[in-house]
Amino acid sequence: MQRENEVQHVFLVGAKSLGAYGGYETFVYKLTEYHQNKKNIKYHVACKANGDGCMDETKVDGVTRINDHEFEFHNAHCFKIDIPQIGPAQAIYYDVAALKACCKYIKEHRIKHPIVYIMACRIGPFAGHFYKEIHKLGGTVYLNPDGECEIIWTTRKKPEFMRVCAA
């Protein structure tokens, strides 16, 4: 259970960028924008470093660049994942690489009780491995089971428990 003065670290995996590319991207943009002044929440957002829909933080106002693959935006720590051009398998590769990066960051920074929110269910047989690793690190995993983030965000016609997970 989180104490009042502790920061809740939330890792977001599944959006290619922060911006107008699609539903997940808009969801993450609005979520981080809405919570940017909250001192007790720290978002860590995985972004695609190259290819279609990749994050180009130089085109976004308010970005603080950390290095070639990390930046701060809306008080969220954003990190870019390099993706090989392997056709439709890019989405799966991105999710697996992003989850590996999340686990590495959690370990290196000794983050207690992290939350990892996976927006799209694309990792299939790899899910169990990451669930075990994140749980072993003291974390919780939330998976958007139907991958309809934009519908949840805009229409709010999902059951109450889905709204809590996605909004």
What function would you assign to each model-found segment?
Residues 38-44, 111-112, 138-139:
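A generic structural motif
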Residues 105-114:
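Glycine-rich phosphate-binding loop signature in dinucleotide/nucleotide-binding domains
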Residues 73-100, 154-161:
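A short, charged, and often flexible helix/loop element on the N-terminal side
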